[in-house]
């Protein structure tokens, strides 16, 4: 019998499957925070719900023995939210008890409950948006879109991928093999989908929902219980998520400990390593540093580990029709959320002899100046700039800006800005530094996370593309952007992207930016270079989260 929540959301699931097959634009979750869509009071209600959580204890009825929480808004104030402190052993014991009936419920229940959680999360998009804004430093519009509907899109994508794999496995089958003149051999076979076990989702501090939802919902949709361990600097968005998930599970008749929160104070690295190597943790989804991701891949051998780590995203400029349009697009990508996106560009390669344009040749210096001026134009008005660049998530990024200044000649210096609504906000404009491929490779072959970019002189476009491909392959990258009107150069760019295992964008000058990745159409990460060992979202991301156990017995032939 079909689970009622599966039946309730089946049409959405069907549309999601169709969207994945065609790879066109589709989303059931409106990305604009419009009162016509979400309700006239939705924004105010969401903000009030967020404010009501501040300086309070976040109540979750799960095993706990104390309180933790030291989040501080990048916009300049302490959140003061305290969360249940949970010891791993009693928590995992409770999760194991909850896992058993959840596993027996079957795929219709797993999918239906997951989709209901997602619908409830969409209703809470404004509350989540304010929590994302004040833990990550994203400006409100990005916090709403990336933290809400876009994250929900990625969650739905994972659920649809999971269902696509689960539905291929029949519950039972009749098998009959002819035996010539003798009666046929006949068997009845039963196939049971067996989830891997307990999943551990390790969140990051810049995109706590967008990067965590795919793993969380891939686990749930394949029948696994999930322990959500947020980054200590961005607990609240995932705490709200867990609260909603537990409410839905309880209403659906399941133990809410199928989804639990494990909140921590800062400097929790030792605890994370202990959690990740527990024998009962069978799945791990991680977003964060290369160092920590590599440690998990090497040491959490009892689990299947999905990682997204650091990378060096790159732009190659060979030729452009309109340098102003190209520079505007690049500048927006550099400024958006102060470069604190895993897809944000860092290295911009320009031939030292200049580039071709519709108006003639532009020198290397003129190209660098065009980009610098475009960034400056976007950030010159503080009131407008802060709605684009947001705030810096933590002091380590500010310190990194200071170190990057000394790497080369500064084309555009980073400046602190005063936020008109939050006077203590940590706001800094992008830094552009000139480097040279001949002498500075040790400086630009690592990620400089934050509002930091390098305009790098190369001997030729051929060298630029060779660098882009080799750096992606060796050091990791999620995005590569190339500007060229030459079809031969574009073909070499495709080959460099394939060599580097990195997504390629060509000649972006309009309203699409290299940072952006659209669910149901764009694959985020390839798993083909060190930046990530998995893709959001393909069959490989979900299929290994369960196994199939069969039983068979002789029966009388039907014929």
Where are these regions (language model features)?
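Short, flexible turn/loop "capping" segments at secondary-structure junctions
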Residues: 71-72, 307-309, 340-343, 443-449, ...
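Short, solvent-exposed amphipathic alpha-helical segments in soluble enzyme
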Residues: 215-218, 300-302, 332-333, 469-472, ...
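Generic non-transmembrane alpha-helical segments
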Residues: 116-124, 244-252, 370, 374, ...
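N-terminal Rossmann-like NAD(P)+-binding subdomain of aldehyde/semialdehyde dehydrogenases
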Residues: 1-184, 218
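Extended hydrophobic secondary-structure segments that form protein cores and membrane-embedded regions
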Residues: 199, 259-265, 347-349, 451, ...
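Conserved C-terminal structural/oligomerization subdomain of aldehyde/semialdehyde dehydrogenase
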Residues: 1-18, 104-112, 125, 253-256, ...
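Rossmann-like NAD(P) dinucleotide-binding subdomain of oxidoreductase/dehydrogenase enzymes
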Residues: 166-327
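ALDH superfamily catalytic-core signature
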Residues: 3-12, 37-40, 213, 247-253, ...
């Amino acid at each position: 019998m079909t689970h009622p929540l599966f039946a309730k959301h089946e049409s959405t699931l069907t549309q999601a499957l169709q969207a994945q097959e065609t790879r066109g634009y589709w989303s059931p979750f409106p990305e604009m925070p419009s009162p016509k869509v979400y309700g006239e009071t939705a924004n105010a209600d969401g903000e009030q719900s967020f404010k009501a959580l501040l300086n309070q204890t976040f109540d979750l009825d799960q095993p706990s023995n104390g309180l933790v929480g030291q989040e501080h808004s990048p916009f300049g104030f302490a959140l003061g939210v305290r969360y249940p402190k949970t010891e791993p052993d009693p928590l995992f014991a409770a999760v194991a008890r909850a896992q058993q009936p959840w596993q027996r419920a079957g795929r219709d229940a797993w999918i239906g409950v997951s989709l209901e959680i997602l619908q409830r999360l969409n209703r809470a998009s404004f509350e989540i948006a304010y929590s994302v804004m004040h833990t990550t430093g994203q400006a409100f519009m990005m916090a709403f879109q990336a933290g809400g509907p876009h994250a929900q899109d990625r969650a739905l994508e994972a659920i649809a991928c999971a269902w696509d794999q689960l539905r291929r496995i029949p519950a039972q089958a009749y098998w009959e093999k002819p035996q010539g003149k003798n009666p046929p051999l006949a068997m009845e076979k039963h196939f049971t989908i067996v989830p891997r076990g307990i999943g551990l989702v390790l969140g990051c501090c810049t995109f706590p929902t967008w990067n965590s939802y795919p793993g969380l919902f891939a686990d749930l949709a394949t029948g696994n219980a999930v322990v959500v361990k947020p980054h200590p600097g961005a607990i609240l968005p995932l705490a709200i998520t867990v609260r909603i998930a537990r409410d839905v599970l309880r209403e659906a008749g399941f133990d809410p400990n199928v989804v639990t929160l494990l909140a921590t104070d800062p400097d929790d690295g030792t605890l994370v390593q202990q959690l990740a190597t527990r024998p009962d943790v069978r799945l791990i989804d991680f977003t964060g540093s290369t160092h920590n991701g590599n440690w998990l891949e090497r040491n959490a051998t009892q689990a299947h580990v999905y990682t997204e780590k650091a990378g060096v995203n790159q732009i190659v400029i060979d030729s452009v029709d309109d340098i102003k349009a190209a520079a505007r697009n690049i500048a927006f990508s550099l400024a958006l959320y102060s470069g604190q996106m895993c897809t944000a560009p860092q290295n911009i390669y320009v031939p030292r002899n200049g580039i071709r344009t519709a108006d003639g040749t532009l020198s290397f210096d003129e190209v660098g100046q065009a980009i610098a001026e475009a960034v400056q134009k976007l950030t010159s008005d503080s009131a407008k700039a802060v709605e684009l660049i947001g705030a810096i998530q933590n002091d380590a990024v500010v310190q990194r800006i200071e170190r990057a200044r000394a790497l080369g000649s500064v084309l555009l210096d980073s400046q602190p800005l005063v936020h008109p609504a939050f006077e203590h906000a940590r706001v800094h404009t992008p830094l552009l530094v000139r480097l040279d491929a001949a002498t500075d490779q040790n400086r630009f072959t690592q990620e400089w996370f934050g509002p930091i970019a390098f305009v790098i002189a190369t001997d030729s476009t051929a060298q630029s593309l060779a660098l882009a491909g080799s750096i992606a392959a060796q050091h990791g990258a999620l995005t590569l952007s190339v500007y060229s009107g030459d079809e031969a150069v574009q073909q070499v760019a495709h080959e460099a992207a394939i060599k580097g295992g990195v997504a390629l964008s060509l000649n972006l000058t309009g309203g699409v930016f290299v940072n952006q990745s659209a669910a149901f159409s764009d694959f985020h990460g390839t798993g083909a270079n060190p930046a990530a060992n998995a893709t959001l979202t393909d069959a490989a991301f979900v299929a290994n989260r369960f196994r199939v156990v069969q039983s068979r017995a002789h029966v009388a032939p039907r014929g």
